Amino acid sequence: MDNHPKILACASIGGHWIQLQRIANALKDDYEISFVSSNEKCRSSVEGHRFYHIKDFTRKNPWWIIPNFFKCLYIIIKEKPKAVITTGSAPCLLCILAARLMFKKAIWIDSIANVERLSTSGKIASKIASRMYTQWPDLAVGKIKYAGNILG
């Protein structure tokens, strides 16, 4: 796999992680994929791949934003991915931001759970990401594209 381009895939646990795993499975033959998650339990589902853990945070508990940002920056410098791809949530915004600061492609795919509007993180990501996708056609406006859904 040494000659395959690298991708850094980031998601929190639950639906975000399941959707990211489906994307990674579709890309595994063409890319070397490393993973980042805010939940250490995700490590066991990606054995054989490099895995990095970042701390979870929310708007109500923002204490890990700065340390996580520097860890994301470190991961991107170390891994040298061609692109960062994420299905969210908030901690993964930092990977997208770090990727853009390092002149890497950053792809945000908003969760399929967001039927009526983009997630709060998705709204922020739409201003940072080089590519932004929704899984609902009605939410595709401007820079935000619809290309189908991951679970369908």
Q: Could you describe each region identified by the protein language model?
A:
Residues 9, 16-27, 40:
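Short amphipathic alpha-helix
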Residues 83-102:
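An aromatic- and histidine-rich active-site surface loop
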Residues 2-8:
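Extreme N-terminal starter segment of soluble prokaryotic enzymes
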Residues 11-13, 31-68, 138, 147-151:
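Conserved nucleotide-sugar phosphate-binding/catalytic loop shared by glycosyltransferases and other
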Residues 60-82, 101:
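An amphipathic, basic-hydrophobic alpha-helix
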Residues 104-152:
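Active-site-proximal region of nucleotide-activated glycan assembly enzymes
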Residues 6, 82-83:
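Structural motif
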Residues 6, 31-35, 50, 104-105, ...:
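Residues at the starts of beta-strands that form the adenosine-phosphate
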